[in-house]
Structures are given as C-alpha cells and as structure tokens.
Amino acid sequence: MMLLMSFSMTCFYSCGDDDPIEQSSTNKDDGKKEPTEPTDSVPSDTTTNVTPEMPTASSVGWPANYGGVMLQAFYWDSFKDSQWSALESQTDELTGTFDLVWIPQSGNCGGQSMGYDDLYWFNDYNSSFGNEQQLRSLINTFKANNIKTIADVVINHRKNVSNWVDFPKETYKNVTYEMVSTDIVANDDGGKTKQWATQNGYQLSSNNDSGEGWDGMRDLDHKSQNVQTIVKAYLDFLKNDLGYAGFRYDMVKGYSASFTAIYNSASQPEFSVGECWDGTNTIKNWIDGTKVNNQPTSAAFDFQFRYTVRNAANKADWTKLGQQNDGNWPLVSAYVNGGNYRQYAVTFVENHDTEYRSATAQQDPLRKDTLAANAYLLAMPGTPCVFLKHWQAYKQEIANMVAVRKAVGITNMSVPTNMASNKDYYAVQVVGSDNKKLLCVVGTKASSYTPASSAWKKVISGYHYVYYVQGIEPSAITMPELPESEQPQQDSGFVGIPAFCTVGHGEICAFFEAPTSWGSKINTWAWMNGGDGAEYVGTAWPGVEANMIGTADNGNKVFKWTSTKATAPDNIIFNGSGNQTVDMTFVNGGYYNQDGLKGVVGQ
C-alpha cells in the first residue's frame, strides 16, 4: 500500500467463598453493550501477528508501589460540574488529596455529549465542558500543583460527519489525517453498514472486528495501518501537545488488547487503564494481552472489587467483602495470582455507568453506606478512583481517609489481611511503608469492633467506618482543612434529622426528605422479600400517600410513612411527580432522601 504522507498532504492507507485477601490466624445513554454484572467471556481475536515497539522502563502500564489516588471528575450528564473552568477553580482543595484526575473525553462530538460519540481528535476542542484554551489551562494548573490529568480515550468506535462512512479531515504537525470507509470493520453494525456502503459505492475493510461490536457508531478496524497511524498521532497530541499524563481507554473489549500494546509502546503514557467490564479472568487476560517483553502496558479497572463492595453495602452483609462475586475474586485479591495483579488494579466503588441516573435509568448503584464503601476503597491496595458525586457529598471525610492512607504509606501493591468478618462489620489490616499499618473496620456495627492489640490507635471514624493506625501516631497525620463553606453534611444518624421526627413505641415507620422538584405529594411503596407491594401497602402503585410532617433546615419537605402491618417490610421506595428512589432496604425509623438512607431516628 502506498503511504501518502508529506507536509500538508492527506495521510491514509487503503487497507462461596473464602476471603480474597490474606487470612489472619486470630438519556443520552452511551449504549455500550456491557453486562450489568459480567461473567468471564473472551471475545474472539482474529488479529494478525503484530510486533509492537519495545517499551522503555516508563511504559509499564501503571507504576509499581504507586501511592497515588485518582478522582473521576465527572458523572453522567455532569455538564455543569465538570466544566474545565469549574474543575480548575477547585485545584486548591484537590491538591494533596488527588494525584490523578480523570476528565471526560475533551474533543468536540458535534453536539452536547459526554464524549463517547467522539468525532474530532485534533482540531476542534470546543466541547460540552469548555473550549481548548480552558482545557489547556486546567491541565497546566493541575500540573503546577502536582496533579496529573488522565484523558478519556475512545478509539473503539468513531462518529461520522455526514453519512455512515465519512470522517473528519484534520491536521496535526503539518500532516493531514483522515479515516476512510475501509477503516471500518467488515461486520460493523451486524452487516448494516456494509449493506449501506455497497448500495452507495463504498467499501469497508475485509477484516471483521477483533473484539465485541457496538452498533452505536462505526467500529474501527485496528488492523488498518491508517487507523494505527492516526491513533498513534492522536495519543501523541493528547500527551505531548495538550499535556495529558495518561489514558483511560474506553470499551477495550471492542478490539484486541494487542493494539493497546502497540499504542502505548508508541505513546509511552505514564498511566494507562482500560475499561474491561467483565469477570476477573477476562480482565486479567486483557492485561496480559497488553504485554510487551512480558510486561503489561496497561492497568484495568477492578470491576469485581466494585461488585463485592456493592454486595456488602446494599445487602447490609459485610462478610461479602471477603467473598467472590459470582465466582470472581477482585484483582487485588491474593487468590488472583497471589496478588500479583494489584499493581494493575484501579479500584472503584461507583462510576458513570453504575450510578443512579434517574428513575428511568437507575443502573446498579450503591444504595447506601457511601462513606463505608469509600473507607474500604481507600484502605485497600490497588489505585483507588473516587467518584465525583461521592467527593462532592463527603469532601472532608474522604480527604481525611486519603490523608491516613498516604501517611501510612499504602500503595497499589500493599498487602491486606482479614482480621474479622461477620454480617455487622468487616475488619482488614493493610501494611504500608516502614511497617506502618492501617486497620479499616466497616459495617453497621463497625464501632463495636475492638482491635486485639492496644498498639492500634483510632485516628478517624464516621458513619459505619473506623480507621486505626499502628506504627505512627495519629497526631502525626495532618488532615486537610477544607473551607467551611465546602464542608459536606456528615453521613450520620445524628446529623440533618429534624427534631420533629419521632418514632412511637412499637411503631413501624420511615421518613423521607423530598427534593422540591418531587412535589407536595409523596407516595410510599413497601414490600416483603418474595412478596408484593400492593399486598403490603394495601393499594396499587404508586402506593400509599405519606404524611408531610415538617420542613428540614434546607427547605425540603419531610414526610413520614407508618405501616399498618404488624411486621416491618424488607424494602421501601418513595416516589413523587414521576420521580422515585431506587429499591432501598427498609430500616425502622430510617431517615431517607433521594440518595438513600441518611440515618435512623432515635439513634
């Protein structure tokens, strides 16, 4: 094939379980076809043999013994909160807590977008989050404050300009790049693209997709030399022109892992993490598939870590932190190659695909115990990634957790040991640097756990979590002081519950603080496990009307529902004006808002 590459010329080619850690002796949906709760499945790989450039020492996918913490600085439709200027204005409070900040895909997508329908790669950075000048200012300001920015990289697929097969023509370093119809996989969109192309005089690649397909846009043929050339140039632009330190690769199951090896070998990012949303074996195989010289060139998100935390929090059974999720241990587990994948595990407890978006797009969220979930996340090995909504709600407490983590010297390769496990609490010890240790206890009765040794000293505690340290004095740990106006409401049964909320003797009831947009009428739907809501509340959906009993300090109306049954329900939903909560575990006297249980009246 002829390379048409010269200055100002177009460049294209035609072509059950035991604990997973050491044991102690004492709508604008992105449409990605990811399973809600993945099990292992390995996509077919028809990639021809490739010989990527040999990586240097810096091209190791993710640093060993890395003690940094990452922030995912967006959620779904966070068009206001994730503006480049808004994020830059928060630099002071992010500094010291977060070492990496992952931001949305920053190119123009041809309209309001979260970035997963990527269109322009080089020449148009007026996105839904700001313009190119604001983006560069954000990255440079972060860099000046020792915060590195992670780019969201979407190269599995690409949006078209005006028809099914045309792409933008863009110039970078005096070279013009343009993808063509033969850069689209032969079996794109189940054959619909090929049918359209044939009818309109175009040809697609002769190669089928090397991974899973996605019908939303054109899946790129990464065997195409033109695609590889343009992707390499794109990554060079992100890293060496815009100033990103690393990449978060979207939907990496859509193409062979060997291409990530090629691209990272060429671009040499300091950090690389792939979204391989699947079971642990598939994630591990993907990491292995990025190897060059037997060295992985990328980390991956530890989805199974997230699912174990979800299982424990949502089911109020903290033993599940020490159990497999549908036969999958987390990557950080000792049962996954003796813990050898911890270096390449980016852990998290919520992201934009799992969060609660709306009543009609509830996803698979954490329903309660956000603080306990983050306390566990920030105590464990792997590189923790905190979700923006969680940071916004609990900045001071999360910042304190990170401060303890860093003071103890916990890294992505630290060794955890299970110290206690029962339904009410789970305790894990993690060894940091210089034999300093952190003991994290989470669960509904976390405060009732007493460490076996008096050498443990409590350093911080909150709603359903306690941190103890050993080998370092609590007074030696400096906690950040966020501006008072930015302090979040504490997630505690004693904070934020109005005094007019009371529970009578033997009364089965719950309280709901409703957002003003939910209207003046709130209904309650409750049910027993295996039972029917209509049977329990005595009426059809949307249930029985709750009584408005007062106004909270923030102006929201507070409603009370009292059961007429002798037995408490297992689950509850509040709804109003077309909005509704997720299915929530019923707690007698529980004080809820749209995010879940905030506390218990009288406790």
Where are these regions (language model features)?
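Glycine-rich phosphate-binding "P-loop"
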Residues: 197-231, 236
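Aromatic- and acidic-residue-enriched segments that line the glycan-binding/catalytic groove
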Residues: 112-122, 157-203, 265-266
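Bacterial Sec-dependent N-terminal signal peptides
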Residues: 7-60, 492
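Structured interaction patches on ligand/partner-binding surfaces of diverse proteins
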Residues: 578-603
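Boundary/entry segment of secreted carbohydrate-active catalytic domains
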Residues: 52-83, 213-224, 509-513, 518-523, ...
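Substrate-binding cleft of carbohydrate-active enzyme catalytic domains
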Residues: 130-163, 169-172
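Active-site-proximal helices and loops of the catalytic beta/alpha 8
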Residues: 51-76, 86-95, 105-119, 136-147, ...
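Aromatic-rich carbohydrate-binding modules that target alpha-glucans
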Residues: 515-566, 578-584
